[in-house]
Amino acid sequence: MTLALGIDPGTATTGYGLVRLAPDGGLVAVNYGVILTPKDATAPARLVMLYDQLRDLINEYHPEIAAVEKLFFSRNVTTALAVGQARGVVMLCLEQSGIE
């Protein structure tokens, strides 16, 4: 059964959920939660923490596929840029892990 990882990226809080297809065609939640980074850490350090924690999650559950929330237009450019950086780190981690 295929295990899918869904990710809602952010620098302070990145949400995730792992679901598996059930025999009846429905979805079964396997795990869900958030990856948190400390507010007092530098931006580069927070991105490294995000990468490391996401890699640990991938190594524990071995999802086959993933979906990452796309950016939406934000009035706060600083926030939009930070979320874009987090999304890039997530996409890098997924690619290096061989996840579609």
Give names to the regions the model predicted.
Residues 1-100:
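Phosphate- and other anionic-substrate recognition elements at nucleic-acid/protein interfaces
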